Every structure is written in C-alpha cells, then in structure tokens.
C-alpha cells in the first residue's frame, strides 16, 4: 500500500515553541525515530496495538545553498540579529529564541555538582535548620502546581521537589477536586525524607481564599484529614517577574540566588519556554503553561531580594544544533 506520512517545517520561537520542542526536539537526538504505542479496543472486545513514529531532522540556512547563492546578503542579515534571534534563525537553536522572558536561564549538566553558572543542579541533603516553603497554584481543567523550596542562610532558594497535576499532555489538568489535591500534597510530604517532619510554610494563589461562591478552596484543603494550611501569596505580577530576574542573575562566582534540582522536570520544561505577551509587553503571555511560574512567583514574593550586580556568564561550548549536548541555554 501507499505509505502515508506528514512533513512539517518550522522555526524556533513563538507561543508554540515549547510544544514543538517537547514533542520533537527533547525526546531523542536528531535523526532518531521516536515511536509511541497506542492501544485501541475493537468492537469484538479485543485490543489492538498501534504505533506512530516521528523524527526531528535539524536544518539551517547552510543546508540551502541555492538561497545563499540567490541572496548573498541574507546570511549577513541573520548574523546581525539580536543574539537570541540569531541563535534560533541562523543556527537553529531551540534553546534561545525571540520573545523568551528568562534569557538568563542556563541548564548545564556539566556543572550540576559544583553548582556554578547553572540554574539546574544535582539534589543534595537539605540541612534541618533551613526554612521550607510550599508554593501552590490551583488548577482543575488546567494543571495544578505545587513546588517545595528550601532557603539557605544567605537567602538563596532551591526548588527541591514538585508535584504537577497534569495528564501527561502539556497544559491538560487531572480534573481532581481540592480535597484530593490536598491529600496528594500531604502524602508527598509524608513520604519524602527531605520534607517529612518539617515545618512547611504554604504560600498560595490568593484566589483560593475566595468565598463568594461557597466554601473556599483553602478551607476545603484545611479540613481533616489533610490539615493543609496556606497563606495568601502576593500576586503582583510585574514585581514577581522581576524577582525571577533578580534571582536568576549570576554573581561573580557563578552563583545565582535561585536553583532547581534536576528532578523538577516540569519546571525545567516550562520556565525557559515562557514568552512575552504581545499586548502587555512587560508581562508573560498567560495563554501558556504558566502554572509553575505562578506558584514559584508567590514564594519569591514571600522572600524578595534587591536588584543584584549583573555578571556575565562564560560562553557555552559551540553546539548550535544540540548534536552533542542535549541541554544548553543562552544568556542574553
């Protein structure tokens, strides 16, 4: 029979950037088929296993000599763009793109252990005297997000654990009620050695305290047997975004004021992909998967810091198509 397939082309950037990257770029090295298996129940009650495959084929302007020959100035036009756009459109990088909010973000696996010049680090044992915070953004049809944070003696925050209520599809929630969400949060804290037995300060979206339509979400979560308590977070959006920028900045020793355990996969997946709102250019586009961002923002606003002195991070190794290293982020 006829082989049916689809070819799709795109450039990095835009609101769909994160979806394309998660589906085609991140799961496997370039040129490696990604196969998914599906089960279909037939009318006679039997089940049939079906497969779908996809593959990412990297390409850049250098693969189109005809275009370069017809328009010799095109290469110079791409090279003259701002750094983020140049990396995306000239070199095909999916880790840096126009409109990216947190251009400071860096994820360098080679530095996970020494914790320098990277925001993602290897997990470590949290000292008993460190304060623990729990951030929460409620969701039903959209994901709910819970993040646990440890604060060291210098005020540096570490995201040490997360609970993200999604189906496995980006931005699709589990549709579970507040009581069940509270049960899962309490269970996570009781079963994790980093959290068990600690005093945890919960900070949440102030909307969960709304009683205009009956019992509030906060009250439901505080009931027996979960006894989960929250304080309303500061929801000032632009000030919260600036706290992100302040904390992501590296000092002269390569240490930021905010780092993330590499086990927090959904934070690492969603935060670098956030883009600006075209209508409100100082804020992020809220149509994105921004639930982790919101939940983290409440915790940062509970622990505000002053604007730091900016220090430039060292350049990453040149690997624009990610052929040898699967995680690199440019700081603009």
Predicted regions and their residues:
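Mg2+-dependent endonuclease catalytic cores in nucleic-acid-processing enzymes, primarily RNase H-like
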Residues: 155-288, 304-311, 315-332
């Amino acid at each position: 029979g006829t082989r049916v397939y689809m070819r799709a082309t795109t450039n990095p950037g835009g609101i769909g950037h994160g979806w394309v990257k998660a589906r085609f770029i991140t799961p496997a090295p370039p040129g490696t088929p990604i196969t998914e298996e599906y089960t279909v129940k037939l009318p006679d009650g039997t089940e049939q296993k079906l497969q779908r495959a996809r593959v990412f084929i990297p390409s850049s302007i250098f693969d189109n000599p005809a275009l370069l020959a017809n328009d010799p100035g095109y290469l110079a036009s791409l090279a003259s763009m701002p750094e983020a756009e140049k990396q995306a459109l000239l070199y095909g990088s999916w880790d840096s793109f126009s409109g990216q909010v947190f251009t400071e973000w860096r994820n360098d696996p080679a530095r996970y252990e020494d914790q320098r010049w990277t925001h993602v680090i290897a997990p470590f044992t949290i000292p008993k005297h460190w304060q623990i915070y729990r951030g929460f953004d409620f969701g039903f049809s959209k994901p709910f997000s819970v993040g646990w944070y440890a604060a060291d003696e210098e005020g540096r925050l570490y995201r040490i654990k997360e609970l993200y209520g999604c189906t496995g599809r980006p931005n699709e929630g589990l549709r579970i009620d507040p009581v069940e969400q509270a049960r899962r949060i309490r269970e996570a804290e009781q079963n994790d050695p980093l959290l068990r037995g600690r005093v945890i300060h919960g900070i949440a979206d102030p909307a969960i305290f709304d009683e205009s339509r009956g019992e509030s979400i906060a009250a439901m979560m505080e009931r027996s047997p979960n006894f989960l308590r929250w304080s309303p977070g500061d929801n000032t959006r632009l000030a919260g975004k600036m706290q992100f920028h302040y904390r992501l900045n590296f000092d002269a020793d390569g240490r930021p004021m905010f780092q993330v355990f590499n086990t927090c996969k959904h934070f690492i997946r969603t935060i670098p992909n956030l883009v600006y709102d075209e209508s409100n250019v100082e804020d992020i586009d809220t149509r994105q998967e921004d639930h982790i961002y919101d939940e983290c923002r409440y915790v940062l606003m509970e622990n505000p810091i002053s604007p730091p002195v900016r220090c430039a991070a060292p350049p990453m190794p040149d690997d624009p198509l990610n052929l040898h290293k699967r995680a690199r982020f440019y700081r603009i």
